[in-house]
């Protein structure tokens, strides 16, 4: 196991990270520490820098300035420990389900792929084609494809946004249960504030390239949907999202 990994999760440290596209400043000297194994949700208005942050962590973009670290190691040096899921499952239609899970792997990987499919409840669909699966099942395959690599960091970019309400709740429960079992670090970008407070240990609001709210969600698990405390936290985040202007220092709340 890489020395930057604590427990099974990757600890993250961002020091004064900025990302510019020409004159457009998307992230502006952002500082962030995420302990190993924490589940963090990131919310905010469109264009605020949420997905850019995930792309930096995934190695799909490089920062204009600042450091992105896994503990004391540059995250780019252990990028194989990071996996990312998108709203689109991105399955190859000409490959079977199990071959999509094992995509890019060499050697004896099929047993591990079957175990990953079993973990997401699709062990009986291994030989089928992606076209035979529902949207939720395709996302389960994408999750299995991430799990087979035993990631230290799982990045989720609106992976449930296109699913119906019931399937979305089922996927939320599945992701949380696998996180509790394996202990990897999770960053979830979502526009759904109720999803953020239901799933995460911590909710970050990114606005104007900085962290405008850093909210601890200390509600015991399993969490009961519709609970008063969840509703209160959701209202607090929504109120902050709707505020105009920008605070120089992040507002920290401990629920």
Swiss-Prot record:
Residues at which ATP binds: 44-51
UniProt record similarity statement: Belongs to the ABC transporter superfamily. Aliphatic sulfonates importer (TC 3.A.1.17.2) family.
Subunit text: The complex is composed of two ATP-binding proteins (SsuB), two transmembrane proteins (SsuC) and a solute-binding protein (SsuA).
Reaction(s) catalysed (UniProt annotation): ATP + H2O + aliphatic sulfonate-[sulfonate-binding protein]Side 1 = ADP + phosphate + aliphatic sulfonateSide 2 + [sulfonate-binding protein]Side 1
Protein name: Aliphatic sulfonates import ATP-binding protein SsuB
Taxonomic placement: Bacteria, Pseudomonadati, Pseudomonadota, Gammaproteobacteria, Enterobacterales
GO MF annotations, alphabetized: ATP binding; ATP hydrolysis activity
Primary role: Part of the ABC transporter complex SsuABC involved in aliphatic sulfonates import. Responsible for energy coupling to the transport system.
Pfam hit, one: ABC_tran
Predominant location category: membrane
InterPro entries, per the entry: AAA+_ATPase, ABC_transporter-like_ATP-bd, ABC_transporter-like_CS, ABC_transporter_ATP-bind, P-loop_NTPase
Keywords: ATP-binding, Cell inner membrane, Cell membrane, Membrane, Nucleotide-binding, Translocase, Transport
Organism the protein comes from: Escherichia coli O6:H1 (strain CFT073 / ATCC 700928 / UPEC)
Subcellular location as annotated: Cell inner membrane
Membrane topology label: Peripheral membrane protein
Enzyme type, top EC level: translocase
NCBIfam families registered for this protein in UniProt: PRK11247.1
Residue intervals of the ABC transporter domain: 12-233
Record-level GO cellular component terms: plasma membrane
PANTHER family registered for this protein in UniProt: ALIPHATIC SULFONATES IMPORT ATP-BINDING PROTEIN SSUB (PTHR42788:SF17), TAURINE IMPORT ATP-BINDING PROTEIN-RELATED (PTHR42788)
EC numbers on record: 7.6.2.14
């Amino acid at each position: 196991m890489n020395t930057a990994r604590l427990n099974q999760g990757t600890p993250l440290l961002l020091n004064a990270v900025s990302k510019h596209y020409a004159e457009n400043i998307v992230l502006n000297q952002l500082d962030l520490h995420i302990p190993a194994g924490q589940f963090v949700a990131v919310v905010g208005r469109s264009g605020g820098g949420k997905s850019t942050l995930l792309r930096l962590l995934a190695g799909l973009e490089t920062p204009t300035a600042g450091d992105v670290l896994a503990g004391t190691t540059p995250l780019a040096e252990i990028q194989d420990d990071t996996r990312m899921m998108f709203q689109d499952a991105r399955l190859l239609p000409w490959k079977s389900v199990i071959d999509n899970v094992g995509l890019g792997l060499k050697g004896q990987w099929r047993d591990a792929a079957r175990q990953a499919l079993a973990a997401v409840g699709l062990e009986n669909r291994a030989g089928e084609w992606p076209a035979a699966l529902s949207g939720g099942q395709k996302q389960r395959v994408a999750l299995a494809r991430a799990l087979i690599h035993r990631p230290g960091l799982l990045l989720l970019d609106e992976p449930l946004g296109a699913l119906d309400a019931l399937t979305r709740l089922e996927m939320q429960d599945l992701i949380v249960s696998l996180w509790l079992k394996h202990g990897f670090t999770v960053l979830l970008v979502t526009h759904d504030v109720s999803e953020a407070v239901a799933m995460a240990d911590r909710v970050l609001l990114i606005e104007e390239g900085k962290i405008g709210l850093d909210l601890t969600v200390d509600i015991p698990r399993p969490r009961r949907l519709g609970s008063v405390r969840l509703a209160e936290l959701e209202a607090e985040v929504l109120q902050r999202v709707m505020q105009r202007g920008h605070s120089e220092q992040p507002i920290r709340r401990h629920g």
